[in-house]
Amino acid sequence: MVNVTVTFTITEFCLHTGVSEEELNEIVGLGVIEPCENETASWLFDDHAAIVVQRALRLRQELALDWPGIAMTLTLLEENDRLRQENRLLIQRLSRFIKHP
């Protein structure tokens, strides 16, 4: 199976997601997304960054949050997901030691 990573220039990313370059600068500055590491001075973004921005835009529209609020919300949602996965793993490990009737 081949993994294909799509990358976007700043202009392509803005057109694809609907954010302005100013908003993109703020989003990157807040750490919501990061440009792909590359050798050139211009930013490139992958498809995961586009998904995160689309999720952020839904939060902005539905909850009327500003970008710092969105950054905090996304961080907390990611932490919640990570803790749920860790909890599932620990429950699986623990179930080996518990006798079921």
Swiss-Prot record:
InterPro entries membership: CbpM
Record-annotated membrane-spanning stretches: none
Annotated signal sequence range: none
One Pfam family cited in the UniProt record for this chain: MerR_2
Protein name per Swiss-Prot or TrEMBL: Chaperone modulatory protein CbpM
Lineage: Bacteria, Pseudomonadati, Pseudomonadota, Gammaproteobacteria, Enterobacterales
Function: Interacts with CbpA and inhibits both the DnaJ-like co-chaperone activity and the DNA binding activity of CbpA. Together with CbpA, modulates the activity of the DnaK chaperone system. Does not inhibit the co-chaperone activity of DnaJ.
Family according to the record: Belongs to the CbpM family.
